């Protein structure tokens, strides 16, 4: 096979290794015969076939291999057992090492590092000061940049973007048009996809799923088997966990907690220090806030408001424009509806129905 380049006498020392500048022996691609390239340790580093090339001050050494039409340029370094192939490009001050692979049309540039057994392929881009390591995979048209870290067995693909100081690790998957940014962390077996966003100091972990156009930010945490979707907003220091579901246009914020098998949906607002758990549902345009607790199989819906230190439990229902607040308790199979109001230390229980414009207090 006719060689396309030779090693020259011009050398540099990198990490105790002697590297040789290469010179083209024939025309190929945009390389002309006589063009000087970058540096390699030996001819095993750069294939003598295909259009692959090492440009300028880039260096390839160790047992690293570059072949196909791959390009290594600027001050990029590829070493150890790394493999760069197809039409991949490594540029800027990027480093690819360990047993990492970059192939197809992927690009690694800036000060990014890809190492371990990580793979970057498809049309994916890794840039800035991002680090991709472990067995992580970045592919599709995904972008990982800024100071992001993707590691473990994490997978980022589709058109997903990971940036800021965000971290994606464990067996987490981020895909679709999802965005993870700020100091957010997505890990364990969590999945974030579609157009969902996780940012700020938020954490999504366990087997939690965030999808559609849902947003999780602030110091919020979503974990366990919780599912958040639709146009939902979860923020502040809110926590969603267990098998809880929050969806549609619902909002959960402040220090609110939703867990167990609870569901919050519609245009419901849940905030303050309240807690919803068990099989309770809050939906419609209902609001639950302050230190209220809703549990059991209770349902709050319509335009109802529950706040203060109220307890709503068992099979109780609050709906219409009803308001229950202060230290009131609504339990058993009781119903509070229409424009009724229950407050102070009132207890509504059994099969009681408080409706119309009734007012109950103690």
State where each predicted segment sits.
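Fold-core signature of tandem repeat domains
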Residues: 54, 60, 66, 70-72, ...
